[in-house]
């Protein structure tokens, strides 16, 4: 049984640019700088296994897999050193990459590394194929049911899964959520939640990129085609940590129109990813799960290959048939560099706790806001989040029900986002994603209010 809180593809998988590649920007450098050489070798093997499985599954099911070259490029002279370092690491680990002087894009580039015959996929076609395979094998996909807890059943052989649609009993439970919804193991404190943006543009066919491209500089710039459209992506930031996410999307649009003049915006969206301090996913048994509860999380923006690789790892764990790369990743040693990254992220979390509370208590909360806007202020000493969306004003307690930070308004998605661990909520407080299992509560004495229609001014 697969239990989904909303519909399949409602969150990150349905909003990914779905590049299926063993060349992943500068990921090899990141992993090598924070892990042992054996861990990097195992990671490269895991990505090859994930790639091969997904390409094979798509070929059998017709899930819309398209072969494309993957290219990591430098947009500045300073970035070339990163390109060359990634090239050397990739070659030394068996990837048949080549070093280019120019990436062949409409803007200047200063070197690139290319890996042939990687792929891109339509994520919704992939999810439909996976759901079909699940049903063919006798499985059930339950949508619209949110898991709220996992505990011990009366039988020692089973776990009890609590959902909004009622309880389930299972011999084994896999938490395949973006971030674990159970706080055991404190994985929420080991992950960095990031949002990034993607846009689809209509451009002349001859202007479509001939591959999948990812820059090494910040802000990130990602490119691929999607049938007759250009997809651009990037401008990521910590969840709830940018004053105006709308501005982040607008900056991406400005950049696209600078280099593709006349491009017509067709659609735009954002997605959420979770990064581990060492770059390698967390996968295996969940602490205090009695050996029945497993997790897979922290795909660090490469979920197409990492999602499959962690699934293969869990299969090996459950069946007792682990491969050498799976065992090597389980035995991964945390180096000081990765510890430092984790400490830095948690210091940032602490800073955002203080900042979010100070900002909320600095001024009174409004009774209502303009359409499409949200604002946090105080009512008494309680932080209160007020928003008006589609003519309805909601007043909520602004304290995130997960760990108590104060949420911030996301003016791109029209949501309340927590800057601590990435929980997100709809304007009415309904939990959308992240580690929070409960929705935000209504502010004391408040109720949902349809906004009064504005009267036209009388003509003198």
Task: Annotate each PLM feature.
Residues 81, 87-93, 112-172, 176:
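Helical element adjacent to the flavin cofactor pocket in flavoenzyme catalytic cores
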């Amino acid at each position: 049984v697969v239990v989904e809180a909303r519909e399949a593809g409602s969150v990150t998988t349905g909003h990914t640019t779905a590049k299926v590649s063993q060349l992943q920007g500068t990921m090899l450098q990141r992993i090598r700088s924070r892990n042992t050489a054996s861990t990097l070798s195992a990671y490269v093997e895991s990505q090859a296994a994930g790639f091969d499985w997904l390409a094979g599954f798509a070929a059998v099911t017709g899930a819309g897999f398209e072969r494309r070259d993957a290219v990591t490029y430098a947009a500045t002279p300073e970035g070339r050193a990163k390109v060359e370092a990634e090239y050397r690491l990739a070659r030394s680990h068996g990837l048949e990459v080549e070093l280019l002087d120019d990436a062949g894009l409409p803007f200047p580039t200063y070197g690139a590394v290319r890996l042939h015959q990687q792929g891109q996929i339509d994520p919704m076609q992939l999810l439909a194929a996976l759901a079909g395979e699940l049903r063919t094998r006798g499985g059930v996909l339950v949508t619209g049911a949110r898991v709220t807890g996992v505990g011990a059943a009366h039988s020692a052989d089973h776990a009890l899964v609590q959902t909004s649609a009622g309880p389930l009993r299972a011999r084994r439970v896999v938490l395949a959520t973006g971030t674990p919804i159970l706080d055991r193991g404190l994985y929420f404190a080991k992950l960095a939640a990031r949002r990034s943006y993607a846009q689809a543009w209509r451009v002349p066919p001859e202007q479509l990129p001939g591959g999948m491209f990812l820059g090494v500089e910040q802000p990130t710039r990602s490119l691929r085609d999607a049938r007759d459209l250009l997809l651009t992506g990037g401008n990521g930031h910590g969840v709830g940590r940018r004053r105006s996410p709308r501005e982040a999307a607008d900056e991406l649009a400005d950049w696209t129109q600078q280099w593709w003049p006349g491009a017509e915006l067709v659609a735009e969206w954002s997605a959420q990813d979770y990064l581990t301090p060492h770059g390698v996913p967390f996968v295996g048994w969940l602490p205090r799960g009695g050996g029945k509860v497993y997790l897979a999380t922290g795909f660090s923006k490469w979920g197409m290959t990492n999602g499959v690789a962690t699934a293969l790892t869990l299969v090996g764990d459950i069946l007792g048939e682990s491969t050498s790369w799976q065992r090597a990743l389980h035995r991964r040693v945390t180096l000081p560099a990765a510890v430092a990254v984790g400490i830095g992220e948690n210091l940032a979390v602490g800073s955002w706790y203080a900042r979010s509370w100070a900002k909320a208590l600095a001024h009174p909360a409004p009774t209502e806001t303009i359409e499409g806007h949200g604002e946090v202020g105080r009512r008494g000493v309680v932080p209160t989040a007020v928003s008006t969306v589609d003519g309805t004003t909601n007043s909520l307690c602004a304290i995130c029900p997960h760990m108590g930070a104060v949420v911030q308004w996301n003016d791109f998605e029209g949501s309340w986002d927590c800057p601590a661990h990435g929980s997100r909520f709809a304007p009415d407080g309904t939990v959308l994603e992240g580690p929070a299992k409960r929705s935000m509560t209504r502010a004391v004495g408040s109720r949902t209010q349809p906004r009064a229609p504005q009267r036209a001014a009388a003509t003198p």
